[in-house]
């Protein structure tokens, strides 16, 4: 165990020392003291681990006598009592020997999960540090740097809290003894997990070195992605090892170990809430820089950080489930156990619902929708998350009340548990405040968009009023309508450009000679609709145009009356003071003063620090000189519009850039669809050819089968005639053999007759001879 702690401490010190350099470049000297403190604490922990290794070995040798083997299952008797009392209890009751078997590995299992939390926090610190370096190089915004510094301090506090839990588990593990076989098995599994962590740490070091070099090309991005996937696989293998280590032990425990497991449960809950707060801060930070649509690399980096925190949520949820399984076997009353289990299930459901909502909010935040419907949806999701956290807080408060009334825990454990639960409540309150801040920022963004729209409306109204004041009073209403139509021509052109359908596979298709062809005739043409509507309306104006003309005429009359009154008063003043030399000198001095401003543009004039004094001087000059047109009053009206012109141009540029990006995305998707469609078309043609071949083969097979039927019938008839012919041939052969046999008999009779005749002839000759 000491070797494992030493290796882990050294790897963490290497990572922290590396991050020390990154944080120095990012945050300056603000966070040096905090990182030095963390590094010093870890060096102290490594030294203490080296000293405790000998103590672990001596205590292990002293407690080997309490080992009992039953069916290849090793049971260890571990307790906080002295060694003599433990030995007596192991001799008296064998049931108590198997009651605490899993407690040898459970704290170490929790220790391994806290180590996973360390690695996750280290990843988050490194990514936040590299993010800080890129942000400092790209922008010198003090507010963004302060927010990033605040987030890093919060993560450092979480890291210190996890370090305290690590020290507590180290102390608990040093007071326990292990059996030889079980210790060897655990040591081998822990060594394998350590190797996985070392490999992941080396990967992180390599990633950090690549980030410091400032390489941002595609090859570096692919290499980074590959290394991140490798690190993720290493962590998954370590998690599997932890699961195997957890299942290798039994499932019974005593009251003291139950209290320790409950402390581990509270620690994991605090880690979960701290990670939730970190995610909220990252989302707030992401929301403040959302308007920078050109910073794709920053968006990808933010997305990777959110994914890392979500993986940390999943790891904590797995630990939560493990501790819940342990809580199933607690030696307490059935009613109390069932009640506690139901409360834990409720809290887990609340956390899972909050995690799902955070994932959905993450996806919505990665997309770039800015309309009011999207803002309302985000607000509703934030309110739902807030309700989930409030429900979880209520469950924790009820759990705290039940723990305060329990009789099995001592005063020290109760006090420590209350302190931990109060810390959880503070974390929940911080998360709620973060949600409220995010909601307020969303409302501010919505108000800003509304103010932008109002500014556009005021600008359009001011332009219309200026045009109306400069024209003749006998202007035709149709001319006003034409002016309004011209002023909105750019917007209509933009709408026509957006409503124009893209050619490709996604459009409507008509059959043509060459196959499928996009049907663009069904697109919406605003010009044709407007022309048709104007033809239907004829020469008369519509209701909205009439109301607009009435509004313009009323405004013209009021303006004319006001100008007439001002001119009348100025004429009277001029008539009363025209003969005064002081008035002439004032007019001349004002004219000379105003002529000095000829080199300034309207925008420079509005941004001038003495703009109000210049407007006052110009107004006085127009009054004294009896000017026919009040240019200064019109210029004062344009003040707000000109000041907002720069912001409007920036917003227009952002909108154009966003439209360009969306167009590129749509074109890319269209190209993807075209390629997929071409592949589908090729596959369809190949399938058709195969179908034709199959049909031809089927026809040929049917023809061959028909021919086979004919051959079979012919063969049957031939075999029938052949059998008859065989019978006839056999009968003919029998008749032939009978005829041959009969001929042979006749021939034998003939030969006998011939011989008899010859003998008779010989006898007759001899008889005649004897007569002589």
From Swiss-Prot:
GO terms for cellular component: endoplasmic reticulum lumen; ER body; peroxisome; plasmodesma; secretory vesicle. The keyword Endoplasmic reticulum applies. It comes from the Eukaryota. Induction: Induced by NAI1. Keywords: Coiled coil, Endoplasmic reticulum, Repeat, Signal. One of its GO terms (biological process) is ER body organization. Residues 49-72, 465-487, 555-585 are annotated as: Disordered. Residues 561-585 have a biased composition (Low complexity). Residues 98-472 are annotated as: 10 X approximate EFE repeat. Expressed in roots. Detected in shoot apex. EFE repeat repeats lie at residues 98-138, 139-176, 177-213, 214-251, 252-292, 293-330, 331-368, 369-407, 408-439, 440-472. Disruption phenotype: Loss of ER bodies accumulation in all parts of the seedling and alteration of PYK10 localization. It is found in: Endoplasmic reticulum lumen. Residues 1-24 form the signal peptide. Residues 187-476, 688-748 form a coiled coil. Residues 466-487 have a biased composition (Polar residues). Responsible for the ER body formation. Regulates the number and shape of the ER bodies and the accumulation of PYK10 in ER bodies, but is not involved in the expression of PYK10. 'Nai' means 'nothing' in Japanese. Homologous proteins are found only in Brassicales plants. Contains a N-terminal NAI2 domain (472-772). Has no interaction with PYK10 and is not part of the PYK10 complex. Interacts directly or indirectly with MEB1 and MEB2. This is TSA1-like protein. It comes from Arabidopsis thaliana (Mouse-ear cress). The lineage of its organism: Eukaryota, Viridiplantae, Streptophyta, Embryophyta, Tracheophyta.
């Amino acid at each position: 165990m000491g070797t494992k702690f030493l290796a882990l401490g050294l790897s963490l010190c290497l990572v922290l020392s590396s991050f020390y350099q990154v944080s120095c470049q990012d945050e300056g000297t603000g966070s040096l003291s905090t990182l030095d403190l963390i590094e010093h604490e870890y060096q102290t922990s490594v030294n203490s681990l080296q000293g405790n290794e000998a103590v672990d070995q001596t205590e292990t040798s002293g407690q080997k006598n309490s080992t009992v083997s039953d069916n290849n299952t090793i049971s260890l008797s571990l307790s906080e009592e002295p060694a003599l009392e433990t030995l007596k209890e192991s001799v008296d009751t064998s049931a108590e020997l198997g009651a605490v078997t899993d407690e040898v590995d459970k704290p170490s299992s929790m220790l391994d999960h806290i180590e996973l939390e360390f690695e996750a926090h280290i990843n988050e610190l490194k990514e936040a540090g590299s993010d800080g370096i890129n942000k400092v190089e790209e922008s010198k915004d003090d507010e963004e740097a302060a927010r990033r510094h605040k987030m890093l301090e919060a993560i450092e506090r979480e890291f210190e809290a996890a370090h305290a839990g690590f020290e507590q588990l180290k102390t608990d593990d040093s007071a326990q003894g292990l059996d030889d076989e079980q210790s060897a098995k655990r040591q081998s599994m822990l060594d394998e997990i350590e190797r996985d962590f070392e490999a992941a740490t080396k990967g992180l070091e390599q990633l950090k070195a690549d980030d410091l070099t400032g390489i941002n090309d595609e090859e570096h991005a692919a290499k980074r992605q590959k290394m991140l996937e490798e690190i993720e696989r290493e962590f998954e293998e370590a998690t599997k090892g932890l699961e195997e280590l957890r299942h290798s032990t039994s499932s019974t425990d005593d009251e003291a170990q139950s209290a320790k497991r409950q402390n581990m449960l509270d620690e994991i809950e605090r880690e979960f809430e701290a990670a939730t707060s970190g995610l909220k801060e990252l989302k707030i930070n992401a929301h403040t820089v959302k308007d920078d649509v050109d910073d794709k690399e920053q968006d990808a980096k933010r997305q990777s950080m959110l994914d890392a925190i979500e993986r940390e949520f999943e790891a904590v949820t797995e630990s939560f489930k493990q501790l819940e399984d342990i809580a199933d076997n607690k030696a307490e009353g059935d009613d109390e156990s069932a009640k506690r289990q139901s409360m834990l299930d409720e809290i887990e459901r609340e956390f899972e619902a909050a995690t799902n909502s955070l994932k959905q909010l993450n996806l919505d935040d990665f997309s770039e929708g800015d309309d009011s419907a999207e803002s309302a949806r985000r607000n509703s999701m934030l309110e739902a998350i807030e309700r989930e956290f409030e429900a979880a807080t209520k469950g924790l408060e009820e759990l705290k009340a039940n723990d305060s009334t329990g009789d099995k825990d001592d005063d020290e454990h109760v006090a420590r548990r209350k302190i931990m639960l109060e810390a959880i409540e503070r974390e929940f309150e911080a998360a709620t405040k973060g949600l409220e801040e995010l909601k307020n920022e969303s409302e501010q963004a919505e108000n800003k968009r509304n103010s932008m729209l109002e500014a556009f409306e005021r600008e359009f109204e001011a332009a219309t009023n200026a045009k109306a004041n400069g024209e003749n009073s006998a202007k035709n209403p149709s001319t006003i309508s034409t002016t309004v139509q011209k002023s909105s021509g750019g917007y209509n052109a933009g709408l026509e450009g957006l409503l124009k359908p893209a050619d490709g596979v996604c459009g409507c298709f008509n059959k043509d000679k060459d196959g499928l062809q996009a049907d663009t005739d069904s697109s919406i043409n605003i010009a044709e609709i407007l022309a048709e509507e104007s033809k239907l309306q004829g020469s008369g104006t519509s209701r909205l145009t009439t109301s607009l003309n009435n509004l313009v005429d009323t405004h013209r009359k009021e303006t004319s009356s006001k100008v007439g009154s001002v001119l009348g008063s100025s004429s009277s003043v001029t008539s009363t003071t025209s003969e005064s030399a002081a008035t002439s000198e004032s007019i001349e001095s004002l004219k000379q003063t105003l002529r000095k401003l000829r080199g300034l543009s309207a925008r420079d004039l509005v941004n001038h620090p003495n703009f109000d004094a210049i407007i006052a001087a110009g107004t006085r000059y127009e009054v004294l000189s009896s000017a026919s047109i009040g240019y200064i009053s019109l210029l004062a009206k344009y003040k707000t519009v000109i000041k907002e012109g720069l912001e409007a141009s920036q917003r227009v540029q952002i909108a154009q850039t966003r439209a360009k990006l969306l167009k590129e995305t749509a074109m890319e998707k269209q190209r993807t669809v075209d390629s997929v469609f071409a592949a589908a078309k090729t596959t369809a043609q190949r399938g058709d050819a195969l179908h034709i071949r199959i049909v031809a083969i089927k026809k040929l097979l049917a023809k061959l089968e028909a021919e086979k039927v004919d051959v079979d019938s012919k063969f049957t008839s031939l075999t029938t005639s052949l059998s008859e012919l065989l019978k006839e041939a056999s009968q003919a052969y029998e008749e032939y053999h009978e005829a041959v046999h009969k001929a042979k008999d006749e021939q034998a009779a003939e030969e006998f007759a011939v011989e008899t005749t010859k003998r008779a002839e010989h006898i007759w000759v001899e008889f005649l001879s004897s007569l002589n």
